A protein has these predicted regions:
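NAD(P)-cofactor binding segment of oxidoreductase domains
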Residues: 2-18, 88-95, 135, 155-182
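Flexible, Lys/Arg-rich cytosolic regulatory linkers and terminal tails that connect or flank
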Residues: 2-63, 176
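Conserved Rossmann-fold NAD(P)-dependent oxidoreductase catalytic core, especially the SDR/UDP-sugar
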Residues: 27, 143, 147-206, 211-212
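N-terminal Rossmann NAD(P)H-binding glycine-rich loop of SDR-like oxidoreductase domains
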Residues: 63-84
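Conserved Rossmann-fold cofactor-binding substructure of NAD(P)-dependent oxidoreductases
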Residues: 117-140
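Conserved beta-loop-beta element that borders a ligand/cofactor-binding pocket
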Residues: 182, 208-258, 282-283
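Substrate-positioning beta->alpha
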Residues: 232-239, 253-273, 293-300
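Mid/C-terminal beta-alpha module of Rossmann-like enzyme folds, strongest
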Residues: 277-313
């Protein structure tokens, strides 16, 4: 697949692709559903294949709750969780419009074995969150709710601390009190020796979970860090897409700048697997593969749109 795309790249044509066999088998798409080349094709490598047994371990037949279910990571978590056949899936989200959108999407998926429950609420509201966890007897929590845009959190640092750090503390304490089996925090590589407020809030959230994991309890706390996720909100991909749609220019601040990337589905599969492997207080760091040059990424996107990069010389 990557070889074919590499051959087509230089040609002045708009490249489109057919659905994968797995997408056809799951009923997500039909054979005649042509689409633009997917983001994963820009990685220049094949996505990591998941361990199916690990994907099922903490989900199949269980009551699962995802915080931040309307976000780019949270919604993909929900998509993958549905196909692992949980007993119930609770979409916990503070933003009404985001919750509405993700619920409408899942209503179209024929999954009679899964009860999907859209719940409005904030992890900062202890009483509300505890009532939900208790009422549904939640067994597994994936905590994806967070403020993650570095400049915005820097400008609104107190809200960043309240949401990312204290929100995690409240959610984790509720999990302990209600004897939730598994609690997985979606963290970031920016928590490593943090140089900004967002990274610091996530690092403190990790330390909170590690401290709680030392208590005598039946709840297993696990943290998973990953870096740049292709096409997530705030990444360069949506920005480049919009710039290409507008006819340019596509802005790259440094032609030699490199970043490590994963697709959203790939990252989420590894999050679910890491959550199943955790023993308590573990921090998993995802192997992001080989670095991708941002200039090359932008060039590929332009070429796959049937356009050419203008030679300024």
């Amino acid at each position: 697949r990557n070889e074919i795309i590499a051959i087509l790249n230089p040609l002045p044509i708009n490249v489109r692709s057919l659905p994968s066999v797995s997408e056809l088998a799951q009923g997500k798409l039909k054979i005649d559903d042509l689409r633009d080349v997917s983001i994963k094709d820009l990685l220049g490598r094949e996505p990591v294949n998941p361990n199916e047994e690990l994907l099922k371990l903490k989900i199949t037949g269980k009551v699962v709750l995802v915080t931040g279910a309307g976000g780019s990571i949270g919604s993909e978590l929900c998509r993958q969780i549905i196909f692992q056949k949980p007993k119930q899936l609770i979409l916990y989200e503070i933003n009404e419009f985001s919750l509405y959108n993700v619920e409408q999407e899942f209503d179209k998926i024929e999954m009679p074995h899964v009860e999907i429950l859209p719940v409005l609420g904030s992890v900062r509201d202890r009483k509300r969150f505890q009532n939900v966890v208790k009422h549904f007897s939640v067994e597994t929590i994936y905590h994806a709710a967070a403020y993650k845009h570095v400049p915005l959190v820097e400008y609104n640092n107190s809200e960043g601390v309240l949401n990312n750090t204290f929100g995690t503390l409240i959610a984790a304490e509720v999990a302990l009190a209600e004897k939730v089996e598994t609690f997985v925090l979606i963290s970031t590589d920016k928590a490593v020796r943090p140089t900004n407020t967002m990274g610091a809030t996530k690092r403190i959230a990790e330390l909170v979970l590690q401290a709680l994991s030392k208590q005598e309890s039946s709840t297993c706390f696990t943290m998973v860090r990953f870096g740049n996720v292709l096409d997530s909100s705030g990444s360069v991909i949506p920005l480049f897409k919009q710039q290409i749609k507008n006819g340019g220019p596509v802005t790259v601040t440094n032609a030699n700048m490199v970043r490590y990337f994963m697709t959203i589905p790939e990252a989420v599969e590894l999050v679910v697997q890491a959550g199943a492997m955790g023993k308590g207080g573990d921090v998993f760091v995802l192997d992001m593969g080989e670095p991708v040059r941002i200039y090359d990424l932008a060039t590929k996107m332009i070429q796959l749109s049937g356009l050419q990069v203008l030679d300024e010389d």
